[in-house]
Amino acid sequence: MLERYANEEMKALWNEQTKFETYLEVEKAVVRAWNKLGQIQDSDCEKICAKAAFNLERIKEIEKTTKHDLIAFTTCVAESLGEESRFFHYGITSSDCIDTAMALLMTKSLKLIQKGVKNLYETLKNRALEHKDTLMVGRSHGVFGEPITFGLVLALFADEIKRHLKALDLTMEFISVGAISGAMGNFAHAPLELEELACEFLGLKTANISNQVIQRDRYARLACDLALLASSCEKIAVNIRHLQRSEVYEVEEAFSTGQKGSSAMPHKRNPILSENITGLCRVIRSFTTPMLENVALWHERDMSHSSVERFALPDLFITSDFMLSRLNSVIKNLVVYPKNMLKNLALSGGLVFSQRVLLELPKKGLSREESYSIVQENAMKIWEVLQQGAFKNTDENLFLNALLNDERLKKYLSEDEIKACFDYNYYTKNVGAIFKRVFE
């Protein structure tokens, strides 16, 4: 975890102090459960819950000998207690404590992620509504296609982010699960009721079945969901980067007073935040393979998953949280240039209306193949003009004029009918209906 890419609230969940505090919370829940089952006296339960404490430095010191951080933890806590310490960590195994504590930490962390996703969705929605009717050219393969609105672009992003909210709700069900089932998961030394009570105290569900550990398909699902979320965020960031290119310049990341874009070129204003988000997304996705490989543990459990999770889980949550907040800020403060969008629309010389003309001809009795041939032939002439660099913004009617002078077209379409094809409103007439689908 790098401090540079961490928000304080999420970072506070993933440190040694919080980890052992959560272990202690689980251990106390187990003590309370034993007490409720009549196996530990009230006085011992009260003493443990009131007095149990640990010291990080002491845990590290003990671990030098034990080579086992959970045993170092329980030994340290026992030193803070009296005779009642005999009931601390009673009847359970290390993974009962560790995995149940991890469920608590992941649940809290995922709630922060969900909050970040909701914030991003609302920001995208608000900006989409703001630019619902802001005309721009749509591009496929990076090449001009047909007129759309910037609002549609943002609405598409918003709808995708909304799908992640649904997916994360399901993932929350999978990870908010504790297990207090003993060394082999067969409840040999503690009844099922102990697990049920302890998890109830902690606000967790119980796993239907476990072995020594909670099964890692749950963790892998989380990693994959966060990777998918990152890919969607990268998609937004990459599009912003393309739209900020100098020759496009339809949007721009906010550029603050005193900000610098280059140590050598004073004129530079770069989409550095979107580029940063793109890089963070690569890091997030990189954890999916080891987390998926953690699913296949030997028999009732081996240790191969532990080292992966010590890296992956903190970094997955911290980086995802930072990515979401940064992207939300980028979208919220994004500068949009509608005039440049209109200017770029005009740069096609009217070619963006080609399909409209194509669809009118078959209505007049011409075959689709011949219609396509006539329209494409005229379009290619305009491409040649564009390729030569002789085009001016005042030539946005190049394609229209070429069609009006084509004798073959005149047999099927009147001048007014051809001109009627060059209407931006035709391409935006369903924007309201689309927005209703997405946002209502």
Curated annotation (Swiss-Prot):
N(6)-(1,2-dicarboxyethyl)-AMP binds at residues 4-5, 67-69, 93-94, 212, 263, 268-270, 276, 307-311. It is an enzyme of class 4 (lyase). Pathway: Purine metabolism; AMP biosynthesis via de novo pathway; AMP from IMP: step 2/2; Purine metabolism; IMP biosynthesis via de novo pathway; 5-amino-1-(5-phospho-D-ribosyl)imidazole-4-carboxamide from 5-amino-1-(5-phospho-D-ribosyl)imidazole-4-carboxylate: step 2/2. Pfam families: ADSL_C, Lyase_1. One of its GO terms (biological process) is 'de novo' AMP biosynthetic process. One of its GO terms (molecular function) is N6-(1,2-dicarboxyethyl)AMP AMP-lyase (fumarate-forming) activity. One of its GO terms (cellular component) is cytosol. Keywords: Lyase, Purine biosynthesis. Gene3D superfamilies: Fumarase/aspartase (C-terminal domain), Fumarase/aspartase (Central domain), Fumarase/aspartase (N-terminal domain). Its EC number is 4.3.2.2. The active site is at H141 (proton donor/acceptor), S262 (proton donor/acceptor). The keyword Lyase applies. It comes from the Bacteria. It catalyses: N(6)-(1,2-dicarboxyethyl)-AMP = fumarate + AMP; (2S)-2-[5-amino-1-(5-phospho-beta-D-ribosyl)imidazole-4-carboxamido]succinate = 5-amino-1-(5-phospho-beta-D-ribosyl)imidazole-4-carboxamide + fumarate. NCBIfam families: purB. Belongs to the lyase 1 family. Adenylosuccinate lyase subfamily. Homotetramer. Residues from neighboring subunits contribute catalytic and substrate-binding residues to each active site. Catalyzes two reactions in de novo purine nucleotide biosynthesis. Catalyzes the breakdown of 5-aminoimidazole- (N-succinylocarboxamide) ribotide (SAICAR or 2-[5-amino-1-(5-phospho-beta-D-ribosyl)imidazole-4-carboxamido]succinate) to 5-aminoimidazole-4-carboxamide ribotide (AICAR or 5-amino-1-(5-phospho-beta-D-ribosyl)imidazole-4-carboxamide) and fumarate, and of adenylosuccinate (ADS or N(6)-(1,2-dicarboxyethyl)-AMP) to adenosine monophosphate (AMP) and fumarate. This is Adenylosuccinate lyase. It comes from Helicobacter pylori (strain ATCC 700392 / 26695). The gene is purB.
